[in-house]
A protein has these predicted regions:
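Conserved helicase motor "Helicase C" RecA-like lobe of SF1/SF2 P-loop NTPases
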Residues: 107-116, 120
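C-terminal accessory "lid"/substrate-recognition subdomains
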Residues: 1-89, 128
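Short beta-strand-centered segment that lines the nucleotide-binding/catalytic pocket of NTP-utilizing
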Residues: 118-129
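Short leucine-rich amphipathic alpha-helical surface patches
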Residues: 74-81, 95-99, 113
Length: 129
């Protein structure tokens, strides 16, 4: 079975998570080009799992376009991982504080993979919330 470890992280506070498997790496996606909801007072104490932040990112950003592209990349990788009997894939999403955009993106990818693949186990970790 393929285990996909998904992380959200902060470039500012702790950097890219280390892959603890023998593979030594994975995909890293930078969400900092998406408008930061944390710049608005009403979102400062919320995170990418909160409804208000989700609604904001759904309606006021290019997040879905970015995620659609990422889903295509990950689908291609997953197929190759299946063919080659690989057992671990690591995918990380970073933003400035690791609270809004990266959390949202990691949650969306986790949901996408869980709904699309019954033969994948996902492990989701938010390093800054």
């Amino acid at each position: 079975m393929l285990t996909v470890k998904i992380f959200s992280f902060s470039y500012l506070y702790n950097g890219i998570p280390k892959d603890e498997t023998p593979n030594g790496g994975g995909f890293v996606f930078d969400c900092r080009f998406i408008y930061n909801p944390g710049k608005k007072d009403e979102f400062k104490n919320l995170n990418g799992k909160d409804d208000a932040v989700i609604k904001f990112l759904d309606e006021n950003s290019d997040m879905q376009n970015m995620l659609d592209d990422i889903f295509d990349i990950i689908d291609s990788a997953v197929q190759v991982y299946f063919e080659r009997n690989f057992t671990n894939l690591m995918i990380s999403f970073g933003c400035t504080g690791g609270q809004h955009r990266s959390v949202y993106a990691a949650e969306k990818l986790n949901d996408y993979l869980a709904n699309k693949y019954s033969n994948i186990k996902t492990e989701l970790t938010h390093t800054n919330i």
